[in-house]
Swiss-Prot record:
Xref: NCBIfam families: msrA
Record bears the keyword Oxidoreductase: yes
Active site: C52
GO cellular component: cytoplasm
Biological function: Has an important function as a repair enzyme for proteins that have been inactivated by oxidation. Catalyzes the reversible oxidation-reduction of methionine sulfoxide in proteins to methionine.
Keywords carried by this UniProt record: Oxidoreductase
Family as reported in the entry's similarity comment: Belongs to the MsrA Met sulfoxide reductase family.
Domain of life: Bacteria
InterPro entries: Met_Sox_Rdtase_MsrA_dom (IPR002569), Met_Sox_Rdtase_MsrA_sf (IPR036509), MsrA_MetSO_reductase (IPR050162)
Name the UniProt record assigns to this protein: Peptide methionine sulfoxide reductase MsrA
Enzymatic class: oxidoreductase
Lineage: Bacteria, Pseudomonadati, Pseudomonadota, Gammaproteobacteria, Enterobacterales
Reaction it catalyzes: L-methionyl-[protein] + [thioredoxin]-disulfide + H2O = L-methionyl-(S)-S-oxide-[protein] + [thioredoxin]-dithiol; [thioredoxin]-disulfide + L-methionine + H2O = L-methionine (S)-S-oxide + [thioredoxin]-dithiol
UniProt entry tagged with the keyword Cytoplasm: no
Amino acid sequence: MSLFDKKHLVTQADALPGRNTPMPIATLHAVNEHSMTNVPAGMEIAYFAMGCFWGVERLFWQLPGVYSTAAGYAGGYTPNPTYREVCSGQTGHAEAVRIVYDPAVIRYEQLLQTFWENHDPTQGMQQGNDHGTQYRSAIYPLTPEQNAAAHASRERFQAAMAAAGDHRPITTEIAHATPFYYAEDEHQQYLHKNPYGYCGIGGIGVCLPPDA
């Protein structure tokens, strides 16, 4: 598949078949030693895609109220894809991060603020120097409330961009969450294990106005 093709989403009919077996990952988060899979009572889940998941995961695990994070794949068709398959552009997935958070400490709207202010949501099928459908900007809401908040935040951020003189249209995908597949264990908490590793995310200098 050529680089040109990787800028266009594969159809479900043409996606790779994948496999039934999930990727094996460590039981505990390498940074805070919380469970990588369990969701404690009262906590909620959010899914975001904003480029290379190494830097995105680190961005969110540093936030107060975030219980755990995981790198993975969302928004595609191929079950339990490998990193190589996702990078081929033939699975339909975006590199995404699963965030388990305590809404009593950090609100979903605060996670959205981190999302919008720390990448460029106008670049379509790339983020910075990373090209391909897996690097697209996306929010995958799990509830009607998350969906409404995501759409409202996109409108506010687009208006804030215009006020700052940036009239590029936002290309961020907002779609109901499809299955999230954990990435291989080597990608989990990658920048903790490899402190000098690559991190290609960065904002555009615009702040998300607060919700009403």
